Amino acid sequence: MLDLKRIRTDFDTVAAKLKNRGVSEDTLTHLKELDEKRRALLVQSEELKAERNIASAAIAQAKRQKEDATQQIADMQKVSADIKTIDNQLVAIDQQVTDIITVLPNTPHDSVPVGADEEDNVEIRRWGTPRDFDFEVKAHWDLGEDLDILDWERGAKVTGARFLFYKNLGARLERALYNFMLDEHIKEGYQEIITPYMVNHDSMFGTGQYPKFKEDTFELADTNFVLIPTAEVPLTNYYRGEILDGKELPIYFTAMSPSFRSEAGSAGRDTRGLIRLHQFHKVEMVKFAKPEESYQELEKMTANAENILQKLGLPYRVISLCTGDMGFSAAKTYDLEVWIPAQNTYREISSCSNTEDFQARRAQIRYRDEADGKVKLLHTLNGSGLAVGRTVAAILENYQNEDGSVTIPEVLRPYMGGETVISPK
């Protein structure tokens, strides 16, 4: 959530930054006007309360002296009625302010490219060279069926579209991947966490999914619970409402969890395969950092995600998302896109973001600065390290062989009992 004081004191800068994110200046102007009206009403309310206190003292004095206090009582009743009217106006204005400010996206960092959509994203670097196949490559969904490791038909029967069963060495490959990813992150200083897979509405607000993106989630009817769309939500909210010791920062968390997405608005997109599912495993990284260190931590987090892809030998590129393509809470985002041979293109497999104090303000996560003793908002960061299903897809396609088998990357073999290849039965 944005700082209302910042909007008030640096309106033009905030308006210009949010314009690049599709926010109308009229919206901010209306918010500023509401804030000014609210502040004026607060002054009036305080003045009237001071009058009421004076009137109350005068009434008490008159009663002690056995004097008629009828007029003073009438005056105080009028003042009290005026205060109630103003308080009701303040409640209404506060709600209007909340309705606007809670759906405003974060302001982009100055280094973020300005653009309308993914066409304006900027490639930063590439790693690895896509393999030159001397046979016709298969898509991962066909490989999965031919190898008897992915069962789409029964997934659809048991649940519905965009669900599947992993089986045999497919299930083992998925498990090997997330154990490998977690082990690599732990080596980099991340604390492993097993989170709840359901959170409450306050947690969804804290990380920015609510109220704006409710339609993208699975809520449990007649409860305060939501299935997590990413482990970012419980990991970030772990410290919601707390004040941390500045000496403990930065703090690194990692977790593997299922992620549940309704994929509202994605009809017709990636209807086959592992790219877009309602339920998938993802290894998440979350950091809590001091503001002056958060962009250095973003580079480190991105490198942690890249490390996984490099050790798996998967070609990828790093993209800096433009203002029009970034997520709601992000101030800056790097996407990692892995090479998918059957599609002859790179597809997102990780997204690493610095939200600065946007989530921390919503969730009230603060730290006490050891230098001056003041309590301040910290910065939160989050990143995929990696999306496991998409990594399975990338391995199946990049490591496929002409005979229909798939070679298992060397780093995963210890996690798969020494298996070296997945072969057709």
Curated annotation (Swiss-Prot):
Entry-linked SUPFAM superfamilies: Class II aaRS and biotin synthetases (SSF55681), tRNA-binding arm (SSF46589)
Source superkingdom: Bacteria
Known EC number: 6.1.1.11
Annotated residues for binding of ATP: R261, S262, E263, E348, I349, S350, S351
Annotated InterPro entries: aa-tRNA-synt_IIb, aa-tRNA-synth_II, aa-tRNA-synth_II/BPL/LPL, Ser-tRNA-ligase_type_1, Ser-tRNA-synth_1_N, SerRS_1_N_sf, SerRS_core, tRNA-bd_arm
GO biological process: selenocysteine biosynthetic process; seryl-tRNA aminoacylation
Keyword Repeat (UniProt): no
Statement: the UniProt record of this protein carries the keyword Ligase: yes
Subcellular location(s) of the protein: Cytoplasm
Amino acids binding L-serine: T230, A231, E232, E284, S384
PROSITE patterns for the chain: AA_TRNA_LIGASE_II (PS50862)
One GO CC term, this protein: cytoplasm
Pathway assigned in UniProt: Aminoacyl-tRNA biosynthesis; selenocysteinyl-tRNA(Sec) biosynthesis; L-seryl-tRNA(Sec) from L-serine and tRNA(Sec): step 1/1
Recorded family membership: Belongs to the class-II aminoacyl-tRNA synthetase family. Type-1 seryl-tRNA synthetase subfamily.
Stated name of the protein: Serine--tRNA ligase
